[in-house]
């Protein structure tokens, strides 16, 4: 069983997984935890050219950026990156079951939806679909958690639709989860020296 299942392998989902995996290496309370990322390969970032993302060379394609993020996540053996489409997520007792369209099933203690803002075809009662109020385009959606242990990040959380805010949202959710496990506010800062 996984500690966290991240549904969505775009910028926010990968940023969340990266921060969780890094935290699991740094903090005793998170050591040994395993993480799942399910990626349908449909991130909007795949169509982007990045010109205003802090720390990213101007003109970097979204595909290049996602490949870089994915490679960073793959450095952590505690993260399982799975390609597929999630069709259903249910809560069974204290656990969540993530069901893919090909029949594979995974269990996790917590679930993070990082599914974008176009549509939400996942069958679940764990989130409410609401209008995305910060999208420059009409008809986009956001998700509101309805159950304990459910988190939402990136565009799905109603964030401004930019790569930098999506990454920050994923990192913020990961810090919330790490803090939950620690019983206090925790931030996995990098240090010099």
Question: Each PLM stretch: what is its role?
Answer:
Residues 4-64:
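Beta1-alpha1 glycine-rich phosphate/pyrophosphate-binding loop at the start
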Residues 137-147:
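Short, flexible loop segments at boundaries between secondary-structure elements
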Residues 24, 153-191:
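A conserved FAD-binding loop/helix module that cradles the flavin
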Residues 48-105:
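N-terminal Rossmann-like dinucleotide/flavin-binding domain of flavoprotein oxidoreductases
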Residues 109-138:
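Glycine-rich beta-alpha-beta "Rossmann" dinucleotide-binding loop(s) and their flanking helix/strand
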Residues 17-19, 123-126, 164-165:
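Short amphipathic alpha-helical segments
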Residues 45, 121-122, 160:
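Glycine/Thr-rich phosphate-binding loops of Rossmann-like dinucleotide-binding domains
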Residues 5-7, 105-118, 150:
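Short hydrophobic core segments
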